[in-house]
Amino acid sequence: MRRKATVDRRKLSEIIRRIVKVAAPEKIILFGSAVRGEMGPNSDVDLLVVKGGKYNRSRLSGDIYINLHGVGQAVDVILVTPEEVERYRNTHCLVIKPALRDGKEVYRV
């Protein structure tokens, strides 16, 4: 029987720690191949990062990626507000719907 390929728990914990340190989000949802157990050698870790309040999305995203440098894993961060999650939770063409449906909450305040 073949084992499912998922993200290393220690790496995921470090990624979450670094994101929380920079962004102080309300919630982080892991989704994509890491949740499905289909990670390959070129897979990244997909994270929906939910943060409310006023902030410059581009600057905060950049700060998150800078802080993830050297973590040893490719990471794709999608930064959204709680209002966007509610507004687009049923929209098929956005990543929010599959992240909520199939993802795993890995951090919550």
What is each PLM-predicted segment?
Residues M1-K27, V35-P41, G52-V109:
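Catalytic core of pol beta-like nucleotidyltransferases
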Residues S43-V45:
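Short, conserved active-site loops that position catalytic residues or coordinate cofactors/metal ions
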Residues L48-V50:
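Short hydrophobic/aromatic beta-strand micro-patches
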